[in-house]
């Protein structure tokens, strides 16, 4: 609609019960002037309402070295509304440039989880929390690129979530080997430090991070189709609740992004939630 940005790297979507939509974008930091990460609001008829206010610490300089804000292709992958629709959450996929380095085989890193609160009919930024990410799991080759990042959130309540972490490493060359690691956690904000007043958390050792408990390691699921062999799990980065089964069990649906690549596929996997 009028006023909407002409280009986006859209990733997450959250829809209210009335059909109102919010769409997160990683932005386009690889071009100058840079398009910043965003969460954009649309009506039920997909009319453009406008962007939510993003705290400056997530924003990159308009040109020059990326010394501040989200790194390239590591912005707002995730997006979720709480069940009462009073809070909206997204997160940087990995550490902000001023917060620290990304994950490697020998070190983890810390992403920032960002809360918006509904006030007067609009969502405004409120708190931020340190979200810990593990080191990239070992692979049997020397990668040219590696990452472990937070790619999806699914709210269970005001402070409880399912979160999806995706690790990835790739070898140089068009036919280089790849490895993907998908893990889903039950996540709690209870007791975590609000870091919204801190432009940088680099070197801070007294922060209490978001608490995480592993509930699904996709690489360890033996019932996956043969094409989804452990060493080449696809690019899973979406998650929502699926249909309720006949016995009353809830389900979880996860989806992969094929990146328009002939080497990848779009998969939908449905899991029964066992309490």
PLM region spans:
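Sequence/structural signature of beta-propeller domains
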Residues: 1-275
């Amino acid at each position: 609609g009028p006023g909407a940005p002409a280009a986006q790297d859209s990733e997450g979507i959250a829809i209210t019960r009335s059909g109102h939509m919010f769409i997160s974008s990683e932005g386009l930091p690889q071009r100058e002037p840079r398009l910043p990460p965003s969460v954009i609001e649309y009506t039920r008829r997909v009319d453009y309402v406008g962007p939510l206010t993003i705290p400056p610490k997530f924003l990159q300089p308009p040109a020059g070295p990326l010394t501040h804000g989200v790194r390239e292709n590591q912005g707002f992958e995730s997006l979720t509304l709480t069940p009462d629709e009073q809070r909206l959450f997204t997160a940087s996929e990995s550490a902000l440039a001023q917060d620290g380095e990304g994950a490697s085989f020998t070190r983890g890193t810390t992403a920032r989880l960002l809360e918006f609160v509904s006030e007067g009919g609009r969502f405004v930024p409120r708190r931020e929390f340190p979200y810990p990410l593990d080191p990239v799991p070992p692979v049997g080759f020397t990668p040219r690129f590696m990452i472990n990042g937070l790619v999806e959130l699914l709210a269970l309540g005001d402070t409880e979530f399912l979160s999806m972490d995706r690790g990835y490493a790739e070898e140089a060359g068009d036919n280089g080997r790849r490895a993907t690691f998908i893990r889903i956690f039950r996540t709690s904000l209870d007791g975590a430090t609000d870091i919204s007043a801190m432009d940088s958390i680099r070197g801070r050792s007294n922060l209490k991070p978001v608490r995480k408990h592993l509930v699904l390691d996709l690489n360890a699921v033996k019932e996956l189709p043969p094409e989804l062999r452990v060493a080449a799990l696809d690019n899973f980065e979406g998650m929502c609740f699926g249909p309720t089964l006949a016995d009353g069990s809830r389900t979880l649906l996860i989806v992969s992004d094929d990146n328009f690549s002939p080497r990848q596929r779009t998969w939908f996997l449905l899991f029964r939630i066992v309490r």
